[in-house]
Regions:
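Positively charged n-region of N-terminal signal peptides that target proteins for export
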Residues: 1-4
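Bacterial N-terminal signal peptides
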Residues: 7-15
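Processing junctions and N-termini across compartments
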Residues: 13, 31-32, 89
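N-terminal leader/targeting segments
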Residues: 20-85
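Broad, structure-driven detector of short, well-ordered beta-strand segments within folded domains
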Residues: 78, 82-89, 153-163
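Long, charged/polar, surface-exposed segments that mediate recognition or autoinhibition
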Residues: 79-141
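Glycine-rich, aromatic-bearing surface loops/beta-hairpins
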Residues: 136-181
Length: 181
């Protein structure tokens, strides 16, 4: 399944059109980076780890905030006006990208445009759509799964956004391959 998924994933990792405003560009850059890293390398996260080796690592004590208790590594991806953080957890086939600030509405639109159009042979199914408040910070999480009748693997995509200026992370997008229930 992973060998057939790789070429399909590459098709979806194409660059996005140039945006008109800074907010749009910021969201587009976030989505483009996700597409060319976590998504494009999902079946082979070890190769992504090799490509990220030249980027500055997040210090180990801080990396745990991005790894969510899993084994893996996190890197700082230089970007103007702010850097991104990418966390790769190969043992769990899980990759996540974090933005300190993002245009939540545009990131959500791009995410939904993407996950609702799976490659041929897959269906897209909404899994979760929740609004939460933690420590006074409001977040919105949207999760989709792609399913194929001939595979036990389910690429699962999750986006969490916040429009709260006090939020330390305003966008987090991740992908993991989960086994069927």
């Amino acid at each position: 399944m992973r060998k057939t998924l790789l070429p399909l994933l590459a098709v979806f990792a194409l660059p996005l059109a140039h945006a008109a405003s800074d907010g749009q560009k910021q969201a587009d850059d976030f989505t483009k980076l996700y597409s060319s890293t976590c998504f494009a390398y999902l079946p082979e996260l070890g190769k992504l780890t090799e490509k990220l080796a030249d980027f500055p690592p997040v210090p180990e004590e801080d990396a745990q905030n991005f790894l969510r208790g899993y084994n893996g590594k996190a890197w700082i991806v230089p970007h103007e006006p702010e850097n991104y953080i990418i966390a790769v957890m190969p043992e769990h086939e899980h990759c996540a990208l974090y933005a300190y600030h993002a245009d939540a509405a545009r990131v959500e639109k791009q995410y939904l445009d993407f996950v609702k159009k799976p490659p041929e042979g897959f269906t897209a199914e909404p899994y979760e759509d929740t609004h939460d408040t933690t420590d006074g910070i409001k977040t919105h999480t949207i999760t989709y799964q792609w399913k194929a009748s001939d595979s036990e693997d389910k690429p699962t995509f999750m986006l969490t956004t916040s429009t709260d200026p006090q939020s330390k992370i305003q966008a987090m997008i991740s992908v993991a391959i989960l086994a069927k229930d």
